[in-house]
Regions:
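Long, compositionally biased interface segments
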Residues: 216-276
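A generic structural motif
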Residues: 29, 113-122, 156, 227-230
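Extended intrinsically disordered, low-complexity coil regions enriched in Ser, Thr, Gly, Ala
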Residues: 33-55, 120-144, 231-251
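Hydrophobic alpha-helical segments and helix pairs
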Residues: 91-137
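N-terminal low-complexity, intrinsically disordered segments
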Residues: 1-104, 276
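Aromatic/basic-lined ligand-recognition segments
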Residues: 10, 82-101, 105, 144-224
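Short glycine-rich, low-complexity/disordered patches
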Residues: 51-79, 138-156, 179-182, 254-276
Length: 276
């Protein structure tokens, strides 16, 4: 049902569905990563955000991933190449979440947030990663931003299919659990990739519903919004404020509009009541 949902905003609504957020900025290769990390570690704001630091060897992250996070609680990695990741953890940003990490490599920085019930806002995390990129512009004025992205994964388990559609819009996915004959649904998923010409942002939108044991249902909504070099926006992004504006006002606001389009008005009403 197409209903007006404009009254629901990020300021008056709180979602209980949000499980994980990834904020990521890709850039041209840093010449001396270790020296840049020392610069970051010397700042006051990083010590206000994170308590601990370590290096790890891992495969580079790939943002084009299948939505399995709700079950595994982690983002799976696609193999590209082995890289050193400088990881800041034990996040001190209030309210403290169950697991938040800041990763920096020679080609990207990302913040991964595993959200708990006390999660309130993405803004302090956007501010943190914008500080990183702002320091990078100062450290190396020749740095070129190649991609800016936010990915949000919402999901919940339900007792039955009717309960699913009290939260998620039914017309956003197939309606029947019966395929044909005696065949019954195990899992269905839909992924759309498109360019939103109004916001000038690329979107990967995945919706999946899986039948679990005892005929319970798991629904996952996975929204990835990003801006890359093909959109001719990043060339003018040369400071912290530019990064912050793209993440907060262009990308995150648009992801919230997509989220609203995929959940019911009844659920949005309950979110306002809970928030108040």
């Amino acid at each position: 049902m197409n209903m007006d949902k404009s009254k629901y905003t990020r300021n008056n609504f709180h979602s209980s569905l949000l499980k994980q957020i990834i904020i990521r900025v890709d850039f041209s290769n840093i010449t001396d990563l270790n020296k840049f990390i020392l610069t970051i570690k010397s700042t006051d704001w990083i010590r206000e955000c994170f308590q601990s630091y370590r290096t790890i060897q891992a495969n580079n992250f790939n943002m084009n991933l299948s939505p399995k996070v709700f079950e595994d609680k982690v983002i799976p990695l696609s193999v590209i190449e082995t890289a050193t990741i400088h990881r800041f953890y034990e996040c001190k940003i209030e309210p403290v979440q169950s697991d938040v990490t800041l990763d920096i490599t020679d080609t990207f920085t990302s913040i991964t947030i595993h959200c708990n019930d006390t999660y309130k806002s993405i803004n302090p995390y956007i501010d943190c990663i914008s500080n990183i990129v702002g320091e990078l512009f100062t450290y190396d004025p020749f740095t070129q931003i190649q991609r800016i992205a936010i990915r949000k994964i919402d999901g919940q388990d339900f007792e039955n299919e009717d309960a699913v559609y009290e939260v998620f819009e039914k017309d956003k996915s197939a309606n029947s659990t019966l395929i044909e004959g005696h065949a019954r649904l195990i899992k269905k998923s839909y992924t759309d990739a498109y360019l939103d010409t109004y916001a000038n942002i690329k979107i990967n939108l995945s919706r999946s519903m899986e039948v679990l044991l005892e005929n319970k249902y798991r629904y996952v909504l996975d929204i990835d919004g990003y801006i890359d070099t093909s959109l001719n926006i990043l060339n003018n992004c040369r400071d912290k404020q530019g990064i912050q504006d793209i993440l907060q006002f262009r990308t995150n606001e648009h992801l919230f509009c997509i989220f609203k389009d995929n959940v019911t008005k009844g659920y949005l009403d309950s979110g306002i009541k809970d928030h108040e």
